[in-house]
Amino acid sequence: TVTHSLANSNDDTVLKALIDIAENAAKFLRPAIDEVFNLCLQTMQQKDEFEESRRHLALEVLVTLSETASAMVRKVAKKYMNRLVPQLLEMMVDLDDDPEWSIKDTIEDEEDDSNAVVGESSLDRLACALGGKTMLTYILTTVQTMLQNPDWRYRHAGLMAISATGEGCHKEM
């Protein structure tokens, strides 16, 4: 099975193939939508078992599927967004504290493949693809607690999440 292949291999071919299918023939995945979501969410959650790049590919499967078959994903969103959105927000908290930040003349862009950047851009893409009716409840529920956290990284991630989802959720906001 696909799950067995992914779990017992260091090869990302399965996830790359799922991304290609999601881009070019998303309807083909309709009968297996639950399996695809569960596989990708499980991969994303296993930080100790899989490298970041593989977890990012699993996320890309879900985001691409949401962009190319938004109606199909909206139908199952209630089952999975309560797990996916907190995962994205958790990725956005993965920031390094730079003690020299306040004295630098120029601000360096973060790496494009850092968890924080991938999480934020994925949240933006999901909000644009699925809209505020689908996404906003899940985002606000998690962001409210993040904004009250004493750790600056959580507050930063919460504010960035609101900013990132503004375009896709503007009618509901």
What are these regions (language model features)?
Residues T1-M173:
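Karyopherin-beta/Importin-beta family HEAT-repeat alpha-solenoid scaffold
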